[in-house]
């Protein structure tokens, strides 16, 4: 019996394009591309409900199909990648590695650039390198940069002149442009060398340092020549510690691909100047499509203008639409791109290394699952729960005398933080300092939606003792969910007594040893809810402070406040922003930028 309605094809042309499948709630659940939309969609009408696979499950949920016609198949591929990133459809391949990897940013848009670690890219003039899967490797790189090319690390885009250099200058960790100790020409030469290093062009950097050393020697400037010599030695020592991948000096990305059941692990080795400089891994669970399709979609999602491909990509097998994919990736780079499926030689060793790393992902996943099974069993037994708590949620209320009140809900699944289910709730109905009332409001909103969507947790952790737990149980009784999940209160008592765990219907608290894995896990969840709440609460306070200060400036309304925050960030960053940076914000012209800059600088000097 066909499930895909043929009426969808009536208005569909025989042209290339993209199709979006929507469910009953008008949510995009799948995005696909086609050289011929009619032929591609017709293939779904032939699919029978008697087949038991992911396609069957998906097609049963399809209520509507939208199509977007493109001129070429390449345009369809570009649009498909863009729409997948935008909608994150349930049945497409979404690259997730559950980690917020750091980047190294070089603020080349500033007059005197800085080098720093950041957690996310901003749409500014900075150059970003990464992400670094190993924080240790990233900090080692920053340490090397600071020792070889010591740029300023003071805060603020604008350099503030000083009469005396800072401590970093005195210990040789800063060139001290603030005191006029270095010319901008020499400073920017150091920036260029840092960019070469971060781009993986270590051979080019060594050649440049040797050239400058010889020039300094010819000028009889032996002190400067000695400095270049020391930089060369330090750089060579660092490079010798890296794994030599091959006898060449190529830049390559090497893909490893391993499937186990309905899960795929992908590992990407980064080879720069013939050295393995790092890697990144992804899990793709319950995927839709053949291995060649999965690999093709993984590659098209991974690369973009912010993450351009290197000169060479090595793959374990041929992806779907090989030529089209090559053409698509070529748009993201200025050099000639080669995509190879090696059959012999050193390149096959690299691909096997990437495959081995992908297999290791499964081993680590199995180890985590075994660890959680043991911990989950202990939690159930120690707390006398009705079920193993695969999902645990915890709520924290943050406010200062009732101001900027929010509820922060965190969720842990299978022993790990499930950040896709973290939520902030702005308090709507309670005024003044009423923690119980705020708690009731947030819980009602969370559980009413949870009942409707069928996603209640197995265990709910209340941050507090008997009083807070009693309030939670009152809400549970009103909603009829007292037995749908387990409930625990965790209260920090006097220091010598430690943490106490409270259960509904039990008079005395459960006392666990301070080193108990069960207690430590519950404390970790509770502390994460505090951190999540405090971070957002601080952001709200900053916005309120910004609003009050900007309200005094003529020409600034709510829309421009939002634009300033979106473009620049916090109040602190807006206060530190240069005139040029303020003018880059949409709707802020030169006159208004000067007015904002003058006003905020005056307020800052007063404080």
Swiss-Prot record:
Signal peptide per UniProt: none
Residue ranges annotated for the GIY-YIG domain, each copy included: 14-93
Task: Give start and end of each UVR domain.
Answer: 203-238
**Any GO BP annotation:** SOS response
Record has Transport as a keyword: no
The entry's localization annotation reads: Cytoplasm
Query: Where this protein primarily resides, as one coarse class?
Result: cytoplasm
Q: Which GO terms describe its cellular component?
A: cytoplasm; excinuclease repair complex
Keywords (alphabetical) are: Cytoplasm, DNA damage, DNA excision, DNA repair, Excision nuclease, SOS response
GO terms (molecular function) for this protein are: DNA binding; excinuclease ABC activity
Assembly, per entry: Interacts with UvrB in an incision complex.
Could you tell me what this protein does?
The UvrABC repair system catalyzes the recognition and processing of DNA lesions. UvrC both incises the 5' and 3' sides of the lesion. The N-terminal half is responsible for the 3' incision and the C-terminal half is responsible for the 5' incision.
Q: Which family does it belong to?
A: Belongs to the UvrC family.
The protein's name is UvrABC system protein C
- Taxonomic path: Bacteria, Pseudomonadati, Thermodesulfobacteriota, Desulfobulbia, Desulfobulbales
Gene that specifies this protein? uvrC
